[in-house]
Amino acid sequence: MRTPLLPLARSVLLLLVLGSGHYAAALELNDPSSGKGESLSGDHSAGGLELSVGREVSTISEMPSGSELSTGDYDYSEEYDNEPQISGYIIDDSVRVEQVIKPKKNKTEGEKSTEKPKRKKKGGKNGKGRRNKKKKNPCTAKFQNFCIHGECRYIENLEVVTCNCHQDYFGERCGEKSMKTHSEDDKDLSKIAVVAVTIFVSAIILAAIGIGIVITVHLWKRYFREYEGETEERRRLRQENGTVHAIA
């Protein structure tokens, strides 16, 4: 199916090439800026036909063959590299548009634009003076009588007013007093009472120990006396029994 399409493609390409060559020749003939236009103006002469034919032949020779197009081995990059680069674009015979090139900025202008304007320090001497000025202590003015039983203290970091309470006082304004159950005299009396109780208890214990010792000694002596009496009675009974046997 591809073989009948090749001659059609070739004929179409030839027609396109011929038309483009003819259009380019007409543009060059009508261009007023070129010197060749004056000599080739008017009707198409034989030389003009030869020029157009020569250009058509050159363009035909530059176009790839049908076999290269069918195989796809043709490199289009070489064709585009060989073409001369045009600085402008031709829209019409009487109008020609050229590329606009922006002027380059000087280095001095670029450096000036990059440099930022220096900011002026606000305040100057007055600003330094304001910083050096200390804030007023509110304890001397607003919170002078804030603490009832204590001293007012102002913490600058936290900006808080606190009270340093006196002894036995507490609370936010040191208005509450802690009530003690025992005084110092009571403490001394309690100590004396504890000492007296310990002495009394120790005396009772010693007395009990002494009484116990006395009772044990008395009981021991009594038991010993009873034991001696029993032994004497046994001796007497033995002696009496011995005399009775002797008489008998």
Swiss-Prot record:
Disulphide connectivity of cysteines: 139-152, 147-163, 165-174
Primary residence: membrane
Lineage top rank: taxon: Eukaryota
Biased composition (Basic residues): 117-136
Gene3D superfamilies listed in its UniProt record: Laminin (2.10.25.10)
Function noted in UniProt: Ligand of the EGF receptor/EGFR. Autocrine growth factor as well as a mitogen for a broad range of target cells including astrocytes, Schwann cells and fibroblasts.
Subunit structure: The immature precursor interacts with CNIH.
PANTHER family, sorted: AMPHIREGULIN, TRANSFORMING GROWTH FACTOR ALPHA
Protein name: Amphiregulin
Gene assigned in the entry: Areg
